[in-house]
Every structure is written in structure tokens, then in C-alpha cells.
Amino acid sequence: MMTQANAYFYDGADVALLNGQYTDVFSLLGMHSANEGKALIVRCFLRNALSVDVISIKDGRKVASLDKVNEQGLFAGTLGRRVKPFLYLLRVEYPQCQLDIVDPYQFDSLLNSDDIYLFGEGSAERAYEFLGANWRQTQGVEGVHFCVWAPNAKRVSVVGDFNHWDDTRHVMRQHLANGLWELFLPNVVEGAHYKFDLVYQNGERHAKSDPMATQMECAPHNASIVPPKAHHSWNDTAWMSKRAATAWHKAPMSAYEVHLGSWRRKGEQGEQYLDYQDLIEQLIPYVKEQGFTHIELMPISEFPFDGSWGYQPVGLYAPTHRFGDANGLKAFVDACHQAGIGIILDWVSAHFPKDPHGLVRFDGTCLYEHEDPRKGTHPDWDTLIYNYDRGEVRSFLLSNACYWLREFHFDGLRLDAVSSMLYLDYSREPGQWLPNTYGGRENLEAINFLQILNQRLYQAFPGICMIAEESTAFAGVTKPTDQQGLGFGFKWNMGWMNDSLSYLGRDPLYRQFHHHQLTFSLMYAYTEQFMLSVSHDEVVHGKGSLLHKIPGDDWQKFATLRAYYGFMWGHPGKKLLFMGCEFGQRNEWNHNQSLDWHLLAYEPHQGVQRWLKDLNHLYQAMPALSVQDYEGAGFSWLDCENSRDSIFTFVRYGLAGDAPLVFVINMTPQLHTGFRIGLPLAGDYREYLNSDSQIYGGSNQGNAGTVVAESLPWQGMAQSALITVPPLGCLVIGPATGLAEAN
């Protein structure tokens, strides 16, 4: 028997509710006082329900049966003589089953006014704790609190496995003042799939992935996933304490850049990714053995297109499904730390893709992106640029950075494409960009965001490293923010990379005419805190592998590559090398397959790998190679002008008591005997490393491990020695025992 709707519903409210057009659902559904406080009424909307009883959660007793208002599923009824609100569930009889459902519309808002204020201001560092899908408990009831920012939406519902994707079932509570929509849902299980269903002002409906989802489906599917309740138990206290006490600009730092999807694969055809447990067992011991201090991961925020390598993420808070879940990733980071390896994450804050389930026109308006395409569209990648002037967008990004550092214990972030953030005319022709308020080309809002980001992160997470990929001469990238700098800890040295790789590709006969390409970087080496990077970008898109860039036969290629690495590790600045380069991968990097590990069956590749390993271990053992990376006193040319022989000689200095190291690099196949070099100290010297040694695949030309200084001034030094300089080789020479008075 049906009850007239107007007995329980305001005029027309029942129809609006059925059509999904009633947005203030909390004023209608749930438990409400009626008859001037003399009664209680409960209303609910449950499609296909046959009957609904109200059950007290406290004692499990039935309080009342609700009247069926219509066949579409509206139920309502008064609760006898009860006048004081109480917690209840709805016992719902369906054609095939009976379910007990805790009514979500009986709960008050769970949002905190301070959180809301900080989010709108642009300074929220923990927005992920109240936005997205979070396990919460209120009034003794456990459930998932869903919350999303969509200020211009007409209506927002949460849809998912738990409501058969019915957009009218769980319409969310709207907060007009701040644009947030929320709903606390009991009866939701871990792993449930969900989306936010938005009705735009023009009436269009769009299902969107949760911008703050911490887990997502694998492509081509794109639902968000309710996270597990269990969290990883960390065991890296010793590392975190050591990290906080380390001044990384004075410490050895050599990073191994890794694309997790192609470092190594498994399966008969190499069709399967390694999972995090595989990586714990295989990648970490390898990196440790090779002597790298850090791993830098290419982006792992969820991304739909494999070919983007992660640089077009849709789920910025969701670790990609490809290698496991969030707890698996945490276990991997934890294992890195327990092995004494730091881990840096590539972070994409410069742009986002146009995938329709993502951030693009999220609530029917340009919410995350700038509405003017001259400022909001990236011409190179056909992606969208964040509106850094909007407080909520800044909070979204700032909180995301904090999320990876706080929840996953990453040791820093490497920001991709910073140059595109700094300039309004980046890759744009005249007329295609908007000047700033002063008529200039600098993106003042993005600059301010980067300054605040670095300032906040360094303050909140002691010992982290913030690294910028910045390819222009923008001044002050690594200057402190109180000196009007951007506040990064390090900047990739793109100038050094371009010059040195250009030099590497030249015939040895003509390198004498391009000598400056290896010396010029020392003219500006101390203007920023540089990291020398040979990244994935240098071995893709037809550029070929490092080995492929080098002219000559195989012997010359491998010898040149070893000498180049010697120059790189001797040059001031921290180091980054892309995976595969450490053993001389021949083919260009392919993200769809494993590195060519079979090459290590051949001695030349073994030799390069062994050379890199020994360079790294020497780098960590000798303070002269890192402690004064950013001080002029840490480096001195012996001879930077020997273009005729293409030989470079220099000294690296540590602090008082640290042994200096002399580097001699020969970039031609010519063997030099009786070659005199200046030495900073008197006494016997040891040939620490020789890239031409037979163990590295060389011709075994050198100094039999020892060099003796004589009192003959040379190259500005009071001592010198005659040495043998191997062809296409690198020598690293240092005091054999003790230290005498330096010049």
C-alpha cells in the first residue's frame, strides 16, 4: 500500500529526488525532527526495495516500519513516541535478499573548519586526509568518508560497487561556501571501486575518477579504489635519522635513474612487470653492489598510457597498479633505506593530461587548469597547465608532494619540466601567450608556488633533496627562498650534458677543435648546486644509446665511454645515470621491454659495469669528490688548454686532512708516455683507478699502480711527475700514504 508523498515530502521534493535534481539531500533524507519537535521522521531512497524497517543500533530492536511512498523506492515514516535522535540502520527487504544498511544521511559533516580554510588558502599539506576516500569512525560507526572539490557542479554523487553505480543512491552533502562535497558511507569494503558522478550546470553528467584516490584500476579502466585499512610498519628509523643529519650538498650522491617497467621483466617473453617484492630482491642488491647512493624513480603516479613513461599522470596520489599496491611500494622504499640507499621520486607538477576521467574541466569548468588556453594549455605535449594562482590547486599539489614524502618516506622529489613552469612564453610564438602583471614573461604564480613548495618541504622533512630539471639560465634555482631563489637543493646541469654528449659524438681527430665543450661547464659550475645528469631523455627518440653516439670501432666506443664516465665522476656536482648506461647498453631504451642484460655475457660490457662500480665506490670513499662540490676550493685545473692532445687534467680537493685526487683524461686513441703533470703534494702516489686496465677491457697501459712525485714545479704545482697516459683513458691518482703540506 502506497502512502501519499505529500505526507512526508515537501511539495515536489520527491520528484526532484527521484530525478537526481535535489541537491540538498541532507535536509530531506535521514532522520529529522517533525511536528515541532514532538516526533521523529526517517526518509530514505532505496531502489527496488520491498520494505524497510528502522533498527536501533544500540540494542538491535526494531523501532518502526517505514511506509512505501512510491514504486521507485522512496520510503518514509515516523518513529512512534521517540523524539530524541539515535543511531539506526535500515533493514531492507529486496526481492532476492535482506540487507542491513547504516543510513549515511544520519551523520553530521566530518569536515574540519581549519582544514577547509587551509585548503582554500593554498597551504594545506594534508588535504589527502580529508579529501578522497578515507577510513573514518564517527559515533562508533566505521565507514569511508568521501570528499571532493567541485564548486561549480550542480550535483555530485559517489557511485560504485556498493550501490550498483546508481547516481541517485548516494548524493553527497554540498558545502556552498568552499565547493566541497562529502558523504560518510558505512557498509563499504576495502577494494571497492568508485567514482564521483557530477552533474554540470548545463545538465551534462560525467563520471570522474577521484583526484585524491590512493589506488586506481589498471587501464583501460579508470575507477578509483577504496584503500585497505592496514598500513605498512616502517623499519627505517636509522636511515631517517641519518638522512636528517646529512648535508647532501657536501655528501656523495650518485643516483641510478630507473623506469620500473623496463629495468627487468619476467615471464617467458618478458611480458610481465616485476612487482615490488621482485624489485626488493633484485634491484636493491644490484644498486648496492654497483655503489650508487640513490635510486631515482621515473613517475609512478597512476598513468593510463604506457608510452608517457608516467609523465602524464591522471591519479597523482595513486601509485600505479603495475608493480603492486601502496603497501608494496612502502615496503620497497623501506628496504632501500635498510640497505642504505636513498630514493628520489620524479614528480610531475608542470602539467596534466586531457583524459576525460581526469582533472580536465572537472566540474564543468576549468577548475584545475587556467581557463585561457594561452596560459592553460601546453603546446608541446597537448596537455593542460595547472592554475597555480588558485589556492585549492596549490593545496592539491603541495599536499601531494607531502603525501609522497610523509606517507612513503621518499627522500626527495625531482621536478620535471620546471622551465615550462617558469616562463609564460615557453614553446610559444608571439601572440600565443599572456604576459604577467608587469608585462614580463615570467610565470609569477608558478614561481611563487615553487618557492613555497620548497620552503615547506625542507622545513617539514629534514634531509630531503629537491631537484629541478631546469634547462634555461633562470637565475637562483638553487638559491634559498629568502634570497629570492626558487629554493631547490639541486639543479640538473643540462648545459654540461648537452656539451659533453656533443663532444662524445665527435671523431677523436676533431675533438681538439671542440675542447671547450668539456671545459666550459667549469665557468659556471658554482652558479648553482648542479647535478650532472645523463637521463632517459638522452637515449630515446632516435638519439641512440650512449655507446651508439660514440664514433669508432667497438674498442674505441667502450674506452671512450669509460673515460667519459671518469670525467663525469671527477667533475664537481652530484651524479645521475640512467639504467643500462652503466653496462653500455647498445640499443636505444625501449619502455616496452627489459634492458639488454644478456650483454653482460660479453667482456666489454662487463668492463664498463665494473668501471662504474669502482668509480662509485671510490666516490663514496674519498671526500675530495663531494665535500666541496659547490666551492671553488674543491676543484683546480692543472691544464684545461691542451686541446692538441685532447687531454684534461685537474685536481679535486676535500677539506683539511682529506686526500686530493688528480684526474687525467685522454679523449683520443693516442698513447702518451713521459707525460708530465703537476701534483699537489710531495711523496708517492697511488693509481687508484685506470679505465684502460685489463679488468675493464682496456689495453693495460698505465703506471703499474704507482706514481712518484719529484720536486719539479709544473702546472702551478711545486711537484710533478712523468706518467703514462693511456689511450681514450682516465686515470685517478692520489697520495699513497699520509699527507704532506699542500701547495
Swiss-Prot record:
GO cellular component: cytosol
Involved pathway(s): Glycan biosynthesis; glycogen biosynthesis
Active-site residue list: D416 (nucleophile), E469 (proton donor)
Top-level taxon: Bacteria
Reactions the enzyme catalyzes: Transfers a segment of a (1->4)-alpha-D-glucan chain to a primary hydroxy group in a similar glucan chain
This enzyme's EC code(s): 2.4.1.18
GO terms (BP aspect): glycogen biosynthetic process
Keywords from the named record: Carbohydrate metabolism, Glycogen biosynthesis, Glycogen metabolism, Glycosyltransferase, Transferase
GO molecular function terms attached to this record: 1,4-alpha-glucan branching enzyme activity; cation binding; hydrolase activity, hydrolyzing O-glycosyl compounds
InterPro entries assigned to the protein according to its UniProt record, in alphabetical order: A-amylase/branching_C, Branching_enzy, GlgB, GlgB_N, GlgB_N_E_set_prok, Glyco_hydro_13_cat_dom, Glyco_hydro_13_N, Glyco_hydro_b
Enzyme class: transferase
Entry function: Catalyzes the formation of the alpha-1,6-glucosidic linkages in glycogen by scission of a 1,4-alpha-linked oligosaccharide from growing alpha-1,4-glucan chains and the subsequent attachment of the oligosaccharide to the alpha-1,6 position.
Family under the similarity heading: Belongs to the glycosyl hydrolase 13 family. GlgB subfamily.
Subunit structure: Monomer.
Protein name: 1,4-alpha-glucan branching enzyme GlgB
Naturally occurring in which organism (per UniProt): Shewanella baltica (strain OS223)
Encoding gene, per UniProt annotation: glgB
